[in-house]
């Protein structure tokens, strides 16, 4: 999914579930508003807080793509079929100066 489409859908309250597979520390430093932190290792161990509905549309994004690709593959193994990667990943999202949320310290 392109960043511009995701942003438009976030703003119109039609956003897919946004999965951020980075570590909790990285996630707290900043993420797409509304994203769910589901580190790859937690997905692998089936311990991530994922939606129960495996048909929900999901967009997966990490900083450069490696963990997003792994997360997408693991989610497919667990039966999540409606998943997409964010084009340009979080690096592209930040370069485009799109909304970015940080955890409260």
Predicted regions and their residues:
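Rhodanese-like catalytic fold shared by cysteine-dependent sulfurtransferases
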Residues: 1-17, 24-57, 63-105
């Amino acid at each position: 999914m392109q960043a511009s489409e995701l942003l438009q859908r976030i703003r119109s309250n039609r956003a897919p579930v946004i999965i951020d597979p980075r570590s909790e520390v990285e996630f707290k430093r900043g993420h797409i508003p509304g994203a769910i932190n589901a580190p790859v290792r937690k997905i692998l161990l089936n311990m991530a807080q994922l939606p129960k509905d495996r048909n929900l549309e999901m967009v997966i994004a990490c900083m450069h793509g490696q963990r997003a690709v792994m997360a997408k593959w693991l989610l497919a193994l667990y039966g999540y079929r409606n998943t997409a990667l964010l084009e340009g990943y979080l690096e592209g999202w930040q370069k485009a100066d799109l909304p970015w949320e940080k955890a409260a310290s």
